[in-house]
Amino acid sequence: MEFKVIAEYFDKLEKISSRLQLTALLADLLSKSDKAIIDKVVYIIQGKLWPDFLGYPELGIGEKFLIKAISIATNTDENSVENLYKSIGDLGEVARRLKSKQQSTGILGFLGTSSKESLKVDEVYSTLSKVALTTGEGSRDLKIRLLAGLLKKADPLEAKFLVRFVEGRLRVGIGDATVLDAMAIAFGGGQSASEIVERAYNLRADLGNIAKIIVEKGIEALKTLKPEVGIPIRPMLAERLSNPEEILKKVGGSALVDYKYDGERAQIHKKDDKIFIFSRRLENITSQYPDVVEYISKYTEGKEFIIEGEIVAVDPESGEMRSFQELMHRKRKSDIYEAIKEYPVNVFLFDLMYYEDVDYTTKPLEVRRKLLESIVKPNDYVKIAHHIQVNNVEDLKSFFYRAISEGGEGVMVKAIGKDAIYQAGARGWLWIKLKRDYQSEMADTVDLVVVGGFYGKGKRGGKISSLLMAAYNPKTDTFESVCKVASGFSDEQLDELQKKLMEIKRDIKHPRVNSKMEPDIWVEPVYVAEIIGAEITISPLHTCCQDVVEKDAGLSIRFPRFIRWRDDKSPEDATTTDEILEMYNKQPKKKIESPPIDESV
């Protein structure tokens, strides 16, 4: 299969703003792809060489080295390449223009590159894999030579998307949900197969692997798919409510209640003597927690399992729980063993999804928890999450206050009926989080996605000083604008913000972004931030839950303030539009709705 086919589709996808058209075009590409390498094609579409959970190195080519590779491949002076880049701000476009210039001047033949040669997907994939995996002395020069070799063979369009791929900036607007829908259309006979494909992906979060199974064994093979140790399961997510009475009613009157810890959610896999740890974003974080690997090996029983818990920093003297920020300090230390001594951790387990070749995601919570408790040996490091079973509001409140007093964020209330399965990759009412109220009319913070930026005035003139934020709508796989946040940032954070956003800047609005407001720059929906505000109000300026509460208006957060970045969350883990609506419906209503704020000021 020629790489040119993918490049031509990428070129079309880049210009589309409709998700339906995006999905249809992507399905067309998948259906025309070589089935023998369908997994590689899917990874390339995702902008990666392999799934994140494998923990393999990224390509590791910076702008300086890309410029050198383009210079070598196009026989152009490095300064000229750099000046052109400064002028247009897109290295992919720089490569395309310089390759086009080569073609028009006939220099390709002089360089010994035949225009009849075609770049194959296999060659691109294997060469870029070498680039990523090459380490040691002389590795940078080898990476540059390998990349320059590909660019020499590439036509202008191929060169553009090769460079963007290496940069990690494909800019074609494709999310995992779009790929899933496209796979269902291309291989499953239509949109009706989406649920089957999505379930398989939730159990094995590897789109390339799922695509390979479909083309080799058919869509029916996905129906019997089980979790596999080493491939993370997409985590089950909770809804949120701030009223204990309503929570208990929602879960049927009785529930299992766990502490909600202020730590890092972790999915732990074991097979024989191999142990893997994955973050909630499904990244392999095993190397960050050699102490946890040791604890799991020593204090759990079973040859093969997938369990879930929270890694929490604890005080080395008292054993009391520390905050999430303390855990982040540990991650920033270069000497991991020094970090283990300074920031020790405990693991609080709360679920079991797979054990000895049996899929437990389809079994009730009480069955899963009972088995989980049976495989943990008594010890001081790996424990079952603090929990009780409640059937009245008083006990729920009492346990909630106890969790807060001991350093927790609140509690997780979990349904315990026969239908209380593990809903991989889904957010539902089987789990509901109850967190402490903040000193604000909003009962909780929200996690929102950055979709655009606005330049400041005065001393911040010409620099980004505020952000357009969006909530995630899982029904449409889009990000709907909900506020413009300008407060809560330190000067240092604003300077860092400028750099972060310029790296993901887009020429046009991302096809998954739904916004009436026009920021000064559009960006890829990549970064998630925790935001607090005064209240949620009706606004004609924003698209979150548009036409749901009031015609031609959406919901917005009044007086939003930045709290912190949520690097542990993917954009799809952000607060959903339904959650924003739920928070709006639950907050005390004023007799007259507050007028919308002019956010253009």
UniProtKB/Swiss-Prot annotation:
Where do the annotations place ATP binding? 258, 265, 280, 310, 350, 427, 433
What cofactor does its activity depend on?
A: Mg(2+)
Q: Which UniProt keywords apply?
A: ATP-binding, Cell cycle, Cell division, DNA damage, DNA recombination, DNA repair, DNA replication, Ligase, Magnesium, Metal-binding, Nucleotide-binding
Positions of region (Disordered):
568-601
Q: What is this protein called?
A: DNA ligase
| Gene name per UniProt | lig
Role played: DNA ligase that seals nicks in double-stranded DNA during DNA replication, DNA recombination and DNA repair.
Family stated for the protein in its record: Belongs to the ATP-dependent DNA ligase family.
For this protein, the Enzyme Commission number is: 6.5.1.1
Q: Which reaction does it catalyse?
A: ATP + (deoxyribonucleotide)n-3'-hydroxyl + 5'-phospho-(deoxyribonucleotide)m = (deoxyribonucleotide)n+m + AMP + diphosphate
